[in-house]
């Protein structure tokens, strides 16, 4: 596996920008390259300046509008400045109030059934007016005015929700309208080549009507004009459809789901369905979904940088600073809030309304393809200019013949009108060569395949937040995966327990231990239990671990509400992924203070100095007893159980801080008394082992990075196939986060490639691993769900956040959200990533074949005979097949298992591989040879010698045009499978591909048989049709024979200095395959 990764083309080389080495040198030498993440505006501007801008409106129509991006940033900054000014003003007013200057607020006026108007709420929330809140009776009084219960929320029935939305508004904001179809139509008209063709068409139309009359004279100019209009309409329709598709995907990205309290139970709703009066639980990583006031909280701290631009973390207090701004993130602690403002009645709503039009995104592949288009376009321009000069020279020197064999131009005799008409036709041919030569379909193909892939990935439970992640995922060489919920089902149940100094029945503990365990479970939790009024099963909320422990508490006889009412929380330390534990201090009914801790078993056990024995007495934690518990932990962990310990200690009530000091109190975590250790079963997901094997066969190493015990991680890794039964299970294959953390960067770099499992890791350990792997040249994908995973998700080449267990902070730092938290979905993302790249390569092979063939045929014919067999209208039709229909057919190929049998795609590898060069040259040489032979010897070969010369020439040119188009149609089948011999595999299942082929053929028949005057064709008999079909079909066996021709290992592109932007030079181990 290691050797496979070392030779993989997906690995970064020494000078790769993505590895962070020699960035400036590399970027300077490759204009058409941008980083896959966080490209600077300057870098994005640089490649545009280098691109061929003859037809900029089409070239850049699928790229980021840099001017609009700058305007968006400025608008965001203005609104942030406004929010910042409001906060400063609020602090000033707070100081004034403290000095005795009290701001008065008028009495609340009724608003429907509620006791406060929307205007009053908006003024209070936006000004952070504590005085107004006090006048309304504080948070409880405000809740009464809004007819909500701080502990149970609103009733949540349809009538209540409708009233609240009617009076206070909904949590939505007006979206700026995207570009309409007419705008896309107008943009398509700005293509300079099409404008020149349209001018030529108008001139030809006017001259034709003048010389031949309206009945016959409109054909040439009218045909070109119609063809140009058709290209414009098809381009606009395609662009408009893609715009709608991306808009729908953007809507899905913004649709956050969260829990609210309604009718006493926690229910999950869309952020758009939040109403004023809702009570919302807040936990680390959540986004504050609306403006509101804090009801209660423990160590609650917010990151308000999204609104104020300041990265400072702000502590929130229900008494002193209760106002919460929509859009901020919960950085620490937990609490619950009462919603007071939604939608445009919030600063965040105003911000989103002002920038809600998504401005697209640049992807590295789009930029590289623009580099390809620039090079080919330059050749096309040179060829077109040469053809123009040659045709004009031949015409004015009398070498261009008319239908009677005489010179078309005779100095002093040919009328000026005829000269202008002939020159316009020559110009039209030259411009049309540019239209066909410049492969504008390449950016369209990227957009099509990305849009198609993103839509299909949604069905595969993956929501793409950043387009370039689709491409980058195809290059991934390693995946650092979480265990819980990704490799396992996240359906946890307590199945074993140690308490009273021995292994016990999970449902029967000594009475003394039971009472303390129930107290700890009910208070030291962010979950809850809802008891339906009409009876029925209990409803648990919270994380899977919390649910499992709450369920265990119920089996022990716990009544959740009763247990919570018997003590009150003084202070809480929410679970911390660094410390691997969370604690709470409670005051019991008899005035005692208990500090309860819950967390990773061996970490909590290490803090215990005693335990409660089976008689309910506190006994010292001897070495023997500590070893007994440790062996129990190892035994459970070795059987894939997740081990959690519960402990407590008493604390002197008089030493408990009060006032402001209470919020800063660090709960004591030493001298603990062990209550119980439980083993929680979290089964492996079905099929995850097959997914891991699929990754390994594809050259992608899967590594498990988990906060669980090393032994639990080892057992799960063996079950999932990450570790083989005969693998070396010592360091560094199996390593603990602490050991890795204490190493130097150099030491980490030596072993990081060998790590398969990292247990008891913190989010920072994951970040260190990602950084080390990237330094080693890996393209790293990372899964994460917690707020503290954000740095690793951001640092990785592809950050994958969990959609179910993931916090909003993690999701916002990610590139792709895995909606079902399933590792199998991660593997599907890898398949789609490879499919994006493969589909683009298929289209490049197809399009370049057409480019080369059309250019050579017209150039050779123009130089030798002064005429071209493929007319302007015919070339525009070919352009339509190539740019739009071809892109649609080849860019929407679904991924195949064949893709997962290859090593990862190298992001800096040549786009045109040796296999593609071989395939396209074989087809292009064949087409050029056959069609030029027909051009020069067609009349005799086809037996047309006895026909009228003009008719014979027209039949010959029609056969050339027809055969050329059919060659492209049949060659689309070859392009589907560039390196496979069976080009028909799975073709019937791809209905879109077959539909486009049928449409192309039907339209071609119509053009040849019924639109002769429009397309300069004539009807063909069945024998002539058979010849055309035969010429096209031969491309199939020719492609098959060609696939037996070996290709060199070193990419041809490396030897061609002029093609440097098609890929960076590979090392000697690089392959010329996809």
UniProtKB/Swiss-Prot annotation:
Its main location: membrane. The active site is at residue 482. It comes from the Eukaryota. It is a multi-pass membrane protein. Its EC number is 7.2.2.10. Keywords: ATP-binding, Calcium, Calcium transport, Calmodulin-binding, Cell membrane, Ion transport, Magnesium, Membrane, Metal-binding, Nucleotide-binding, Translocase, Transmembrane, Transmembrane helix, Transport. Residues 1-33 are annotated as: Disordered. It catalyses: Ca(2+)(in) + ATP + H2O = Ca(2+)(out) + ADP + phosphate + H(+). The chain crosses the membrane at residues 181-201, 220-240, 370-389, 427-444, 841-859, 871-891, 912-934, 950-971, 990-1011, 1022-1043. GO terms for molecular function: ATP binding; ATP hydrolysis activity; calmodulin binding; metal ion binding; P-type calcium transporter activity. Activated by calmodulin. It is found in: Cell membrane. Residues 202-219, 390-426, 860-870, 935-949, 1012-1021 are extracellular. Residues 13-27 have a biased composition (Basic and acidic residues). InterPro entries: ATPase_P-typ_cation-transptr_C, ATPase_P-typ_cation-transptr_N, ATPase_P-typ_cyto_dom_N, ATPase_P-typ_P_site, ATPase_P-typ_TM_dom_sf, ATPase_P-typ_transduc_dom_A_sf, Ca_ATPase_N_dom, HAD-like_sf. The keyword GTP-binding does not apply. Residues 43-54 are annotated as: Interaction with calmodulin. GO terms for biological process: response to nematode. The keyword Ion transport applies. CDD domains: P-type_ATPase_Ca_PMCA-like (cd02081). Residues 1-180, 241-369, 445-840, 892-911, 972-989, 1044-1074 are cytoplasmic. Coiled coil: none annotated. Belongs to the cation transport ATPase (P-type) (TC 3.A.3) family. Type IIB subfamily. The N-terminus contains an autoinhibitory calmodulin-binding domain, which binds calmodulin in a calcium-dependent fashion. This is Calcium-transporting ATPase 8, plasma membrane-type. It comes from Arabidopsis thaliana (Mouse-ear cress). The lineage of its organism: Eukaryota, Viridiplantae, Streptophyta, Embryophyta, Tracheophyta. The gene is ACA8.
